[in-house]
């Protein structure tokens, strides 16, 4: 076995790995990035970047990765609920103009990130599969990795004081270091619509149909991605899924969008992705850090995953910078920094993680009390002002305040209760007042377990 050295080994040249590698290389660290497959990836998620994620890219210095890929700037969302719809625009910037998100093909974006990575000083990128983590004689310290590749007949060892695992949502190294079980809540079915007839051009479309929530956003000048919720942990055969889209989803979406979705079922490949939730874990292993989706995942309904990953990359690079950790063999110092990093990241990760699951629960109501909350949420947005700007700042990754999230959530709850009590005949008002307690309880059961999960992890 041959040995090659670096200051830091990064496993995975995806969203987090590329951003982190670029940030560390610019600090003067000698970085080796190992990626199993350097060809353009093809996924149905990770195609919408919120304004907060763009801000994180700017801090790292690689914001130009969104350019030259036919990405489409978005100004917010249009939410469709029954026969009505409500506009949820991104807020204005302090110095003028408005914040924007951007939609793109995931693979094109990753290839741009890899270009930024490979052009960064002090960074080496190697195509190889990491099969094993090396440990020292005590078994307590990770000292490097063992890889295989098409270019080498025998395994190759790479050693470094610090190994950072960024191998994504299907991480093969996670299980040995994280005790939390991964929750699979449901699935997204993905299709690409060609030249759809947008109702609100330049905005993401959130369709709260009777069947399931659907999210649609542009990913090129001629294409839009639609993600359709399919409940349950297991999927039926593909023909059943196509029938579900054609017979249940198409009739329950805005009429202008129906032809393009119907055509996509016949012309595009219907793909699926499990929606997973994993609370974060403090890194306590000497010589190794888990970061990105390998450590923390949230529901993709709100499109906040990449925003969390880019903020993680930026923040982690600061916590292990040469000024913060001069000696990468000083494991106690690194572990202390990891504890600080874990709690510092709570601002943005708490908000995006909890909001993702809260909105998913609200927009897939299982009973009439949850339906009242869903309706209350839409009516809350319709009030305008801070009732719409506050939530979109949270969703867009621009507001990192957990208290603001909890405040808006319970404001939605109380407004939904208010609407519910007044919507029935006067004779039933006493009954509805009693039922309002059940609505409040349902709302609390939605959000409190995830708040506790975030704060205890």
Swiss-Prot record:
Upregulation: Expression is anaerobically up-regulated via the sterol regulatory element binding protein sre1. Expression is reduced in cells deleted for the translation-related genes tif302, rpl2501, and rpl31, rps2402, rps2801, rps1002, rps1601, rps1802, rps1901, and rpl1602; or the transcription-related genes spt7, spt20 and elp2.
Pfam family, one: SE
Free-text activity regulation comment from the record: Activity is blocked by the allylamine class antifungal terbinafine.
Gene3D superfamilies the record matches: FAD/NAD(P)-binding domain
Residues the UniProt record annotates as site (Important for enzyme activity): 77
Membrane topology of the entry: Multi-pass membrane protein
Misc. comment: In Aspergillus, the biosynthesis pathway of the sterol precursors leading to the prevalent sterol ergosterol differs from yeast. The ringsystem of lanosterol in S.cerevisiae is firstly demethylised in three enzymatic steps leading to the intermediate zymosterol and secondly a methyl group is added to zymosterol by the sterol 24-C-methyltransferase to form fecosterol. In Aspergillus, lanosterol is firstly transmethylated by the sterol 24-C-methyltransferase leading to the intermediate eburicol and secondly demethylated in three steps to form fecosterol.
Reaction(s) the record says it catalyses: squalene + reduced [NADPH--hemoprotein reductase] + O2 = (S)-2,3-epoxysqualene + oxidized [NADPH--hemoprotein reductase] + H2O + H(+)
E.C. numbers: 1.14.14.17
Segments traversing the membrane: 347-364, 409-429, 433-453
Disrupted gene: phenotype observed: Leads to the accumulation of squalene.
Main location class: membrane
Keywords per UniProt: Endoplasmic reticulum, FAD, Flavoprotein, Membrane, Microsome, Oxidoreductase, Transmembrane, Transmembrane helix, Vacuole
Subcellular localization(s) per the UniProt record: Microsome membrane; Endoplasmic reticulum membrane; Vacuole membrane
Full protein name: Squalene epoxidase erg1
Binding site for FAD: 15-16, 35-36, 43, 114, 130, 293, 306
SUPFAM superfamilies according to UniProt: FAD/NAD(P)-binding domain
Function recorded in the entry: Squalene epoxidase; part of the third module of ergosterol biosynthesis pathway that includes by the late steps of the pathway. Erg1 catalyzes the epoxidation of squalene into 2,3-epoxysqualene. The third module or late pathway involves the ergosterol synthesis itself through consecutive reactions that mainly occur in the endoplasmic reticulum (ER) membrane. Firstly, the squalene synthase erg9 catalyzes the condensation of 2 farnesyl pyrophosphate moieties to form squalene, which is the precursor of all steroids.
Molecular-function GO terms, alphabetical: flavin adenine dinucleotide binding; squalene monooxygenase activity
The protein's enzyme class: oxidoreductase
InterPro entries per record: FAD/NAD-bd_sf (IPR036188), Squalene_epoxidase (IPR013698), Squalene_monox (IPR040125)
A Gene Ontology cellular-component term: vacuolar membrane
BP GO annotations: ergosterol biosynthetic process
Signal peptide: none
Protein family membership: Belongs to the squalene monooxygenase family.
Pathway(s) annotated for this protein in UniProt: Terpene metabolism; lanosterol biosynthesis; lanosterol from farnesyl diphosphate: step 2/3; Steroid metabolism; ergosterol biosynthesis
């Amino acid at each position: 076995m041959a040995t090659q050295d670096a200051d830091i080994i990064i496993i995975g040249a995806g969203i987090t790995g590329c951003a982190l590698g670029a940030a560390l290389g610019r600090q003067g660290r000698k970085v080796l990035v190992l990626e199993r497959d350097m060809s353009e990836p093809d996924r149905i998620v990770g195609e919408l970047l919120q304004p907060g994620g763009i801000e994180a890219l700017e801090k790292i210095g690689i914001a130009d990765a969104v350019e030259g890929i036919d990405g489409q700037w978005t100004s917010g969302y249009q939410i469709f609920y029954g026969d009505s719809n409500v506009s949820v625009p991104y807020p204005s910037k302090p110095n003028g103009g408005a914040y924007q998100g951007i939609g793109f093909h995931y693979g094109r974006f990753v290839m741009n990130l890899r270009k930024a990575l490979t052009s960064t000083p002090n960074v080496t990128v190697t195509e190889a599969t990491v099969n094993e983590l090396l440990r020292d004689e005590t078994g307590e310290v990770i000292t490097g990795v063992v890889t295989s590749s098409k270019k080498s007949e025998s395994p190759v060892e790479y050693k470094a004081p610090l190994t950072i695992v960024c191998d994504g949502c299907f991480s093969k190294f996670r299980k040995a270091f994280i005790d939390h079980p991964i929750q699979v809540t449901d699935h997204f079915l993905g299709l690409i619509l060609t030249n759809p007839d947008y109702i609100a051009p330049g905005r993401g479309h959130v369709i709260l149909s009777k069947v399931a929530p659907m999210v649609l956003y542009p990913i090129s000048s001629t294409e839009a991605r639609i993600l359709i919720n399919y409940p349950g942990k297991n999927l039926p055969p593909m023909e059943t899924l196509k029938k579900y889209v054609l017979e249940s989803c198409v009739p329950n979406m805005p009429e202008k969008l129906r032809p393009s979705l119907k055509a996509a079922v016949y012309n595009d490949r219907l793909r699926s992705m499990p929606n997973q939730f994993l609370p974060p874990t403090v890194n306590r292993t000497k010589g190794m850090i888990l970061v990105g989706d390998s450590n923390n995942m949230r529901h993709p309904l709100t499109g906040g995953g990449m925003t969390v990953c880019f903020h993680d990359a930026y923040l982690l690079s600061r916590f292990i910078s040469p000024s913060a950790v001069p000696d990468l063999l000083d494991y106690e110092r690194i572990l202390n920094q990891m504890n600080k990093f874990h709690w510092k990241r709570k601002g943005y990760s708490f908000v995006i993680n909890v909001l993702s699951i809260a909105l998913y629960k609200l927009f897939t109501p299982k009973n009439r009390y949850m339906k009242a909350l869903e309706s209350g949420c839409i009516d809350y947005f319709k009030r305008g002002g801070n009732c719409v700007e506050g939530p979109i700042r949270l969703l867009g990754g621009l507001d990192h305040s957990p208290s603001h999230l909890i405040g808006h959530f319970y404001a939605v709850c109380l407004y939904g209760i208010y609407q519910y009590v007044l919507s029935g005949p006067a004779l039933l008002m006493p009954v509805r007042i009693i039922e309002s307690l059940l609505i409040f309880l349902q709302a609390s059961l939605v959000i409190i377990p995830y708040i506790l999960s975030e704060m205890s992890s």
